[in-house]
Structures are given as C-alpha cells and as structure tokens.
Amino acid sequence: MSRVYNFSAGPAVLPEEVLNEAAAEMLDYRGTGMSVMEMSHRSKSYETIIEDAESDLRDLLHIPENYKVLFLQGGGSTQFAMVPMNLMKNRVADYIITGQWAKKAHKEASIYGKANAIASSADKTFSYIPDCSDLPVSEDADYVYICENNTIYGTKFWTLPNT
C-alpha cells in the first residue's frame, strides 16, 4: 500500500506505528481480551484510559488542579451552543468574527441572548484578522469569543486580544 499525504483542515496523516498499534488493540486492548469499543465505560480498564488522558492533558497544557477537564461528545458545532448555554449569564456576549466557525458560533449564541459582533473580517472574505487593539467590549458581556485558528481561510490569532 502506498501512503498518501493529507493536507486537509480536518484529520491528519498518522504515523504507521500509531495505526498499527491501534489496529492490534482493536481486538485486544492491552491484554483485556476486548476492544475499547466493547468496554463498559464504568470498567477499571476504561477508567484508567480516562485518568491517563486527563493526566497527560494536564501535563501537556499545564492545566492546574483547580480546573476541571471535561471529555464531551460532539465537535465544534456542539460547542457553539454549549458556550452560551453555560457562560452567557447576563445574556450578552461579544464575538470577533474571523471566519465560518466564528460566524456559526455567533449565530448560535444569538439564540440565547445578545451576541454582539465587535470586530469582523467578513468584508474581505475572512482573509485577515481584524485589528483587536481597541475592541469595543461590552461592559455587561459575559465573555468575548474568538476562533483562534481559522482552518478554512488559513488565518490565526498570533496574540490573543486583551479583553
């Protein structure tokens, strides 16, 4: 088999070693006699997977113990609703619209309250990150939303706005 390179915005090419290990463990995960897909989410084996994943994330991202790590189903689109549902206490949030993902998040947030577009690069098809040095942040905004890395348009915040 000839391996291909994948330059799409979504999943990337994985090393063959990783794929081979995953294939082997598909039938027998670390000597348990079953695949992870067959395990009870209450089993000790599965709990160990989650505990190790949380520990690795905390180490990699320097997440302090006073923060919770949540493993949630759904992708980015699900988060567009979860963010305002959980953070929009005053029913006001500010959005910096820099691409399709931020645009979708802004639209979803408007269902739950007032979602202000305080900066945007829609005028030039999201080909740049707008100047965020003097943002008109709403006094009553519960949060300011950005999509840091716009995979569709190839733009990225290199420094986060001071909000």
What are these regions (language model features)?
Residues 10, 109, 121-163:
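Active-site phosphate-binding strand-loop segment of PLP-dependent enzymes
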Residues 86, 104-113:
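Active-site-proximal loop->helix
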Residues 34-79, 100, 108:
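Conserved N-terminal alpha-helix of the aminotransferase class I/II PLP-enzyme fold
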Residues 3-54:
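A glycine-/small-polar-enriched, mobile loop at the entrance of the PLP active site in fold-type I
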Residues 113-121:
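A glycine-rich helix N-cap at a beta->alpha junction
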